[in-house]
Every structure is written in C-alpha cells, then in structure tokens.
A protein has these predicted regions:
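Conserved C-terminal guanine-recognition region of P-loop GTPase G domains, centered on the G4
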Residues: 82-83, 89-124
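P-loop NTPase switch module centered on the Walker A-proximal segment
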Residues: 1-77, 86-99
Length: 124
C-alpha cells in the first residue's frame, strides 16, 4: 500500500526519502514503503502492522478511503475491525516460495483472512 501511495503522490518524495533513511538506519531497509503507513515505534520495531492505518486518494472519478489492516495472526481482531469498515478488499499475499503455500494451508493466515473477509460480506 505504501508504494501505491508514493506513486500516487500521497506520500511526498521527502517523506518517502525520510522513511528510506530511517528504515535503513534501523536495519530494515526493505520496510521503507511499509513505514508510509506503519508509523508507530512498535510497528516499525516489530516489522508488522498492528493497528489499522487510514489514508485517502482520488482518481479521476472516484474517491478511495484506504484501510491498511494487519496481517499477522496476533492482530486478527484489528484486521477484522478494519475489514468490517470496507466495501471492497485487496488481500496482499506473500509470494515467497514456501510462505505462499503456508498461507493457504488449512491453518494458514491467508486462508483465514480470505474466509473472514467473505464472512464480513466482502464479495469483491
């Protein structure tokens, strides 16, 4: 979500560069885009989204309210509170070999999130 917000101009180049510097200094350079929405010290230290983050962006014809919800199993209640506010969902999945498959296993987090989204009425 952070990369999309940077590309759309919602996160300025200056803000993004600050996230790049800060994440590199913390030894988490690959988290620079995530830090666009994960702004608390705890989220940044742990490397996971904990609370639902909000942002807004506009296209030519539509105003979007973005809710970035946690994906970690410890924060499923927070994910549910974010998803319950949504009209549509975008489930971002890990594409690393092994991680992707684990997410869709019977006890996988991706499978659980997809099931929760459907049970909350998100059809798209």
């Amino acid at each position: 979500m952070g990369r999309m917000l940077v590309e759309l101009g919602n996160i300025t180049e200056r803000e993004h560069n600050q996230n790049v510097r800060s994440s590199s200094k913390a030894g988490k350079s690959s988290f620079a885009y995530a830090w666009s929405l994960d702004s608390s010290e705890e989220e940044r230290a742990r490397g996971v989204t904990i609370d639902v983050a909000h942002d807004t962006f506009r296209t030519k014809h539509t105003l979007f309210h973005l809710l970035d919800a946690p994906g970690h199993k410890d924060f499923v209640p927070n994910m549910i509170s974010g998803a319950a506010q949504a009209d549509a969902g975008l489930l971002v999945v890990d594409s690393i070999t092994g991680e992707f498959e684990a997410g869709y296993s019977p006890q996988g987090q991706t499978r659980e999130h997809a099931t929760l989204l459907r049970s909350l009425g998100l059809q798209q």
